[in-house]
């Protein structure tokens, strides 16, 4: 394969991995530990 193709596939794979990890942190099991500043403020 050409170098440009390998670089494009690598960058695409990293982007998909990062997006999946971000979604897991936002909505998965670790999201229970995140604090909600709007709930803490309470008017």
UniProtKB/Swiss-Prot annotation:
TM region positions: 7-27
Which keywords accompany this UniProt record?
Chloroplast, Membrane, Plastid, Thylakoid, Transmembrane, Transmembrane helix
Cellular component terms per the entry's GO annotation: chloroplast thylakoid membrane
- Membrane topology per record: Single-pass membrane protein
Q: What is its main location?
A: plastid
GO biological process annotations for this chain's record? photosynthesis
Pfam families linked? PsbN
Domain of life of the organism encoding this protein: Eukaryota
| InterPro entries for this protein | PSII_PsbN
Q: Where in the cell is it found?
A: Plastid, Chloroplast thylakoid membrane
| Family statement drawn from the similarity comment of this UniProt entry | Belongs to the PsbN family.
Briefly state the protein's biological role.
May play a role in photosystem I and II biogenesis.
Can you name this protein? Protein PsbN
């Amino acid at each position: 394969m050409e170098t440009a193709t390998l670089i494009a596939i690598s960058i695409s794979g990293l982007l998909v991995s990062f997006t999946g990890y971000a979604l897991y942190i936002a909505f998965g099991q670790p999201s229970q530990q995140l604090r909600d500043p709007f709930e803490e403020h309470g008017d």
